[in-house]
Amino acid sequence: MRYTTSMDQEMKRRVTACAAGFSLPRYRELPAVGLYLDQTVQLVNSCFRGFPGVELTPSMVSNYVKKGVISHPVKKKYSREQLASLIYIVLSKNVLSLENIDTLFQMQRAHCTAAEAYDYFCDEVENCLPFIFEASSSIRDLDPDANDEKRLLRGTIVAAVNKMYLDCCFVAMRQEQALWPGILGDLE
């Protein structure tokens, strides 16, 4: 199968549209009551609907618990703090090892609450994503006095969102090729 070498304006529009209106629920908006495993997976995946490769499965959650990256559920229910951690893990797992994710969690716990860290993470994702997806022409700079945790978080988010962008581009290119098989190659 042959692919065109560049994205046309319609493909770019579709990729940019993935980022339009994207937002993550803030800590206070996450359910205060515990969720069972399937509900947890469904909620986390709903945050990234439309982004290929950014997903969570029940076996992944079990693996994160087994490796100690997140704590064990209480009576088979996952808490607000665990949901926030899983949302972060789902975004960063394609660019960081579980060991590095766990290191960042430990750094965060030493400096702020789970709610503060998660809400800052949401702000940073919503700052970086539109810029990388070319839906915004600017990105808010990090405070020059930002601590190491914030710098590492920004680096993680930029890497993860760039991966999301590339995945969306390749999906759009494949969809375009599927719509017009053979014709696109003949036009070159």
Indicate where each model-derived feature is located.
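Basic helix-turn-helix/winged-helix DNA-binding cores
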Residues: R2-R109
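Intrinsically disordered, low-complexity, charge-dense segments enriched in Lys/Arg
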Residues: M107, H111-E188
